[in-house]
Amino acid sequence: VASAQFSTPQRSVRVLDAPGHRDFVPNAIVGASQADAALLVIDGAVGGFEKGFSAAPGGALGQGGGQTREHVQLARCLGITQLAVCITKLDTLGDAGYPGTEAVQERFEAIRQQLEPFLKKAGFRPGAVQWLPASGYTGENLVSRSAASELAWFQGPTVTEAVDTFEAGDRRVELPFRMPVAEVLPKGRELGPAAVAGRVEAGAAMSGTNVRVAPSGRIVKIKKLQACGEPLTLARAGDAAEAGLLGLEEGEVRQGDILCHPNFPVPVVRRLEARVATLDIMVPLLKGREVVVHAHAAAAAGQVAEIRARLDPKTGQVQKERPRCVTRNQAAVLVLDLERPLCLEKYADFRGLGRITIRDGGHTVAVGTVTELLEFE
């Protein structure tokens, strides 16, 4: 996931650019799991939005259609509640035979009318969604607008103004230290041979602090902390940080590991219970189905070991105990067995480490939260 840093009058902002192509949805999951808010970039060119928002015949999301729907659902289910929808490439309408300000405004409103009901269904409150046009080619409405442009009709915020209104998420500094490894950095002079980057989910750490690396259990020392290459004295919950680790060699830490407090280690599990919601899937979830379970920056192959209950999606009440299968747009309680251990927490204890995404064959089939940790490594 590409990363960049910039500042607005109110915020210091870290941008995580998640790829839109369906082959890179796991990368998008890693990015969204670290985010407080999302900027959904929509291709407003003729046919662009329709291609991204379409679904394959039969309604299977992400199976031959675009990725807009899947990315929206993943973002919401990974804890993002704040969203700005940025419609771009409206300046290309003239080249496609639709010149003028009126055509640009009509296209903007048409996209909004189609997308808004889906965002609401996905769980985004209308009041938490901002709508704005912008041009990456001309820079129009990124930080300012020109009265002579085709976007002069728009009276809403610029992209930077929209970002300024986002609120920082809940910073759980009072909990034991937790930092998932989102990226293993190349060997360097400043951070040494074992260097990692990620977002601190809970607690805080300083240079010289001892931490445990899970799942290996190795106790190491933080040699140095940085943020975007600049020295960092203290990394607290919510901060993006790079850490050099003393006591490890290159290759001894990997993406998906977690740095944690030595006396309060993160659970390492092979079996878990999760409350999930299926997406618009074509093939029902059955006991024994092989899947891939994604959590924060980690992923592991696994299997649906049990379907304990099917739930009412609105109330959460049990509709049926031990059903044979779970079909599209249903809620259920599953037990998942993992082929290799993952570092997980119950959602009730650490939200950022208790969300999971279930995928199969390159498609997201369900999303949910960890309710119980059943078998430890």
Q: Model-flagged regions — what are they?
A:
Residues 1-14, 55-57, 136, 176-179:
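P-loop NTPase nucleotide-binding/switch module
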